């Protein structure tokens, strides 16, 4: 059976640029979805932390806006694509994705259909309002009500309050999903009693067919300069076994030693990670971080390959290395790992 070393941070705190402590850990969605996908694919998944301490979910990563139901998330992405053909013209930001009520677009479209509009017409109305809300930094429900000329008395059969109710319901469902994912993670035996990486011998490391590291800022604390992580990477790289990391997870690559020629083990590899543009929009990034992951990877020798815009799904596969840029890349990164491990003959080139 294919064995995956599921390498998760056990850090609970990071130090900001001003020296103050800040809570951290792993991102819940990034940890749960790939784990579930790997188990469903029939892989033997061993949860590992550097010291054997249970991993801790980053409180920021449990924020409701990182846990949109898949139907809402996919519909929002399809809406944004209708007016963001030029990503330099309409910049994708976390604020616009999370604070304007746009994630309720699918639900509002269904509401309009219940009011008698066709699916195509409802979608056109929603996309037009979303574009205005995005460009003008206004609430989606307000813009849509104005565009439809809704009367306060509901004489047109629809009110702004009904639209806002869909926005509120979408948030409530996202909050429930975040709590559900946290509960599910806490029930996984490996997350309660992980294996200590420091306890594994070279022979133990040789039994793994791949490594996967989810993100959250935690990996920058205890996985980025860790000799045991370096041992694991060296063992896998010697066999050109899949090495995969998501979002801040590529911090593990900084633990890799130099090759015989004096260059970094992954020098010249194409890869991605959470970018400085995305970091500037996070809570820790706004407070000020000691260092930035994408800069560190570039300085180490990476050929950095980020997506055309922030917050969109972007996965880079170079030989045996698989990296995903951000939380939105979670499923695609996991699927790339499954594809690599399921190939009849694993490609090392």
Model feature map: region roles:
Residues 88, 96-167:
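Catalytic-core signal marking the mid-to-C-terminal active-site face
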Residues 1-98, 161-239, 251-349:
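Extended, subdomain-level signal for the structured scaffold at the beginning of enzyme domains
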Residues 242:
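Active-site cofactor/cluster-binding pocket
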Residues 247-249:
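Catalytic nucleophile serine of serine hydrolases
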């Amino acid at each position: 059976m294919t064995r995956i070393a599921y390498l998760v941070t056990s850090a609970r705190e990071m130090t900001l640029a001003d020296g103050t402590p800040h809570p951290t850990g792993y991102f819940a969605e990034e940890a749960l979805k790939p784990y579930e996908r790997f188990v469903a694919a029939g892989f033997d998944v061993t949860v590992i932390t550097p010291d054997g301490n249970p991993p801790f979910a980053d409180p920021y990563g449990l924020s409701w806006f990182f846990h949109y139901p898949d139907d809402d998330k996919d519909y929002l992405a399809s809406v944004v694509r209708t007016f963001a053909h030029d990503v330099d013209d309409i910049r994708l930001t976390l604020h616009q994705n999370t604070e304007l009520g746009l994630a309720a677009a699918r639900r509002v479209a269904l509401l309009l259909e219940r009011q008698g509009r066709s699916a195509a017409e409802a979608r056109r109305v929603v996309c037009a309002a979303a574009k205005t809300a995005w460009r003008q930094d206004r609430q989606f429900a307000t813009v849509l009500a104005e565009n439809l000329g809704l009367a306060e008395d509901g004489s047109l059969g629809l009110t702004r309050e009904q639209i806002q109710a869909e926005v509120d319901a979408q948030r409530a469902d996202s909050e429930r999903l975040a709590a559900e994912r946290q509960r599910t993670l806490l029930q996984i035996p490996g997350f309660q009693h992980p294996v200590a990486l420091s306890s594994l011998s070279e022979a133990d490391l040789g039994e793994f067919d791949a490594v996967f590291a989810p993100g959250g800022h935690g990996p920058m604390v205890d996985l980025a300069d860790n000799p045991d992580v370096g041992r694991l990477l060296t063992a896998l790289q010697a066999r050109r076994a899949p090495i995969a990391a998501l979002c801040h997870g590529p911090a593990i690559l900084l633990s890799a030693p130099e090759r015989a020629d004096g260059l970094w083990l992954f020098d010249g590899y194409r890869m991605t990670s959470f970018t400085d543009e995305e970091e500037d929009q996070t809570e820790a990034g706004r407070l000020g971080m000691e260092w930035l992951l994408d800069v560190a990877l570039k300085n180490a020798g990476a050929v950095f390959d980020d997506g055309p815009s922030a917050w969109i799904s972007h996965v880079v596969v170079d030989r045996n290395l698989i990296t995903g840029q951000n939380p939105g890349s979670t499923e695609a990164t996991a699927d790339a790992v499954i594809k690599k491990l399921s190939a009849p003959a694993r490609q090392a080139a």
